[in-house]
C-alpha cells in the first residue's frame, strides 16, 4: 500500500486572488502530489491549502510553496481577523496512510531546517515535531503574533518564556527580511478539524463570550480582591475564539477540534447554538475549513439523520444539512471529505 501524507499550509493572504494563484500554481505539476483544496478567506486574510500524496513529493511541494509565499507576501502590510506569525503561518504534516507520526515529524524537521537555511527565515517546530514540550501548541508559539515578533527576537518585553521565545532554526535576531516574512511554524499532528459556527450578529461580542465558554482552556475570572482563577471550558480538546466576518455581516465562533472523536462537530455546533440562543441570537449554520475525515461526517450524520439510516451518502447529506455547512458556500462532499478527495485525485 502506497504511503500518503497530507500537508496543510496556511498562508497569510486571502484577498489577492492573483497572488494566491501564483503561489498555488507553483506546485500544480509536481508528480505524486495533488492540491486537494484552496480556501481563501478575505476576512481572515488567510488561505488554507490542502495537498496530499507521496511523502517525498509532498515535502518537495511544501518547500516550493513556502518559498513562493515568502517571495509574494509582505507581512508589513498584512491585516486580518485570524492570528498569524508570518507569511506562511503554519505548515503541518498529517499521516493519512502507510506513514507514521514519527516519519511526519522527521519531514517537518527537514523542511524547517531547509526553509531556515535557504530562505533565511526563522522557523519553529510544533505539535508532535516540537523539540520542547512548551512548543507543542501552535497557539503558544503564536502568542504576540507578527506584531510582537520584533520585541520577542530583540530581547524586548514579551509574554514568552525562554523555551518558546526563539525559533528552533534560522536567524534569532530581528532584521529587515524578517520584518517582511515574519516567522513560520512547521510541524506534525493528527487530523485536526478547523470548524467555525456562524453567529447572527455583526460584531463578535456574543461569539467571543461563546468562544471563551466552549474552549477547553476556559476563561479567567476575578474575585472582588482582583485575584484570578481559570474556569475550564465545556468542550474537550477544543480551541476557540470569536471573530467578525464583515463580508457576510455575521460573526463566528472559530474553533479547532483537536480530536474530533472526543468532540464531534455536532456537539460543538449544538453547544454554540444553545449558548447563542441564551443571548437571543441564532446560529444558523457552520463552516469547515480544509478537509474533514469521513468518519467525522458520519458521526454527525447519525445525530441528524432519522434513526436507522446507515448509508454513508445519506449520513453525509444529513450532516451537511444538520450542521448548515452550505450556509456561506456550497459544501461539496467529494472535494471536502479527505478519503473521497484523495480517491478522486489518485483516480486522475
What are these regions (language model features)?
Residues 1-348:
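Long, contiguous binding/interaction regions
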